[in-house]
C-alpha cells in the first residue's frame, strides 16, 4: 500500500524524549530490580510480574537472553529437563523430545530467549538494555537499590556520574561473573563477602545445586542462575538450562514470600 508517511524530525525527537522521560520517572522506584536478562533473570521477571510486582530488568547488552542465543558451541539448540520444561511451555516455547532420554527436551536457542522475554514483558516487567549496574545502594546494612550507568559511557571510559534506582529487592542474575555480588564484596570489604567462582563442569551436580544455592545472600540481595553457583562455588553445566529456569522461578517465589504476594 503506497501512501504519504509523516516523518517530521522534530516530532520524532520530541516523542522519544517525552516518552523516555515518562518511563524513567515511573522506574525510579520499583519493587524488584533484576540485574542481568539471561535465562534465570527473565524467568524471575515473568513470575514476579505475573503477581503484580513492579519489576525492572537491567541488561548491559542491547539484547536479552544471556548465553542462550548461541546454543551449544553455536549449534542452535539447548537442552532442558523435567520439570523445568513446564516453565518454557508456559511461555509458548516449542520443545522436542529426545529419543532414549525421556527426561530431556531440546528447544530452539533463538526461540527460547525471544519468547521468554516477551512473556516477561507481557506479564508487566520492564526490560532496559544498554544499562550497567556499577554499584549498589547500601543503607543500614540492607541493599536498597542500584547505581546505574549507560554501558556505552562505561565502555568509552568517560567520567560521567551515574544515577540510581530504588528497589525493595535486587537480584543478581549476571551469570558466571556474579558482577553485582562481586561489586558489593570489593567495595565493602568489612562485610566479609567472597565470591569463589564456579567449579569446572559437572552437569548433574551443577543443575541440582542451582535451586539450592538460590537465596538471599545479604539483606535485600538475592542470587540466582549461574551467579548462585559462582557465589557458592558450584559446578558449571554447559548447554543444559533447566536448572537456570527453576532457579529463576524459585528466586521469584522467595521474593513473593517477602512481599506477601
Swiss-Prot record:
Pathway: Cofactor biosynthesis; thiamine diphosphate biosynthesis. Its EC number is 2.4.2.59. It comes from the Archaea. Its cofactor is Fe(2+). It catalyses: hydrogen sulfide + glycine + NAD(+) = ADP-5-ethyl-4-methylthiazole-2-carboxylate + nicotinamide + 3 H2O + H(+). NAD(+) binds at residues 40, 59-60, 67, 133, 159-161, 179, 226. Glycine binds at residue 236. SUPFAM superfamilies: FAD/NAD(P)-binding domain (SSF51905). Homooctamer; tetramer of dimers. This is Thiamine thiazole synthase. The lineage of its organism: Archaea, Methanobacteriati, Methanobacteriota, Methanomada group, Methanococci.
Amino acid at each position: 500500500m503506497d501512501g504519504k508517511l509523516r516523518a517530521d524530525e522534530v516530532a520524532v525527537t520530541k516523542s522519544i524524549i517525552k516518552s523516555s522521560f515518562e518511563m524513567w520517572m515511573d522506574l525510579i522506584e520499583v519493587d524488584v530490580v533484576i540485574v542481568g536478562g539471561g535465562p534465570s533473570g527473565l524467568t524471575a521477571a515473568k513470575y514476579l510480574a505475573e503477581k503484580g510486582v513492579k519489576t525492572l530488568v537491567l541488561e548491559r547488552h542491547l539484547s536479552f537472553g544471556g548465553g542462550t542465543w548461541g546454543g551449544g558451541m553455536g549449534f542452535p539448540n539447548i537442552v532442558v529437563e523435567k520439570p523445568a520444561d513446564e516453565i518454557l511451555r508456559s511461555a509458548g516455547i516449542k520443545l522436542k523430545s529426545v529419543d532414549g532420554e525421556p527426561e530431556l527436551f531440546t528447544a530452539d536457542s533463538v526461540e527460547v530467549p525471544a519468547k521468554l522475554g516477551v512473556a516477561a514483558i507481557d506479564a508487566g516487567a520492564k526490560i532496559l538494555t544498554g544499562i550497567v549496574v556499577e554499584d549498589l545502594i547500601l543503607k543500614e546494612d540492607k541493599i536498597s537499590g542500584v547505581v546505574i550507568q549507560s554501558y556505552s559511557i562505561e565502555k568509552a571510559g568517560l567520567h560521567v556520574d551515574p544515577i540510581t534506582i530504588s528497589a525493595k529487592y535486587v537480584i543478581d542474575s549476571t551469570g558466571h561473573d556474579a558482577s553485582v555480588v562481586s561489586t558489593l564484596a570489593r567495595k565493602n570489604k568489612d562485610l566479609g563477602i567472597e565470591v569463589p567462582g564456579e567449579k569446572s563442569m559437572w552437569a548433574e551436580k551443577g543443575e541440582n545445586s542451582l535451586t539450592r544455592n538460590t537465596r538471599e545472600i545479604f539483606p535485600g540481595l538475592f542470587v540466582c542462575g549461574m551467579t548462585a553457583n559462582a557465589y557458592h562455588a558450584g559446578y558449571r553445566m554447559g548447554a543444559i538450562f533447566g536448572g537456570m529456569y527453576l532457579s529463576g522461578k524459585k528466586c521469584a517465589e522467595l521474593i513473593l514470600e517477602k512481599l506477601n504476594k
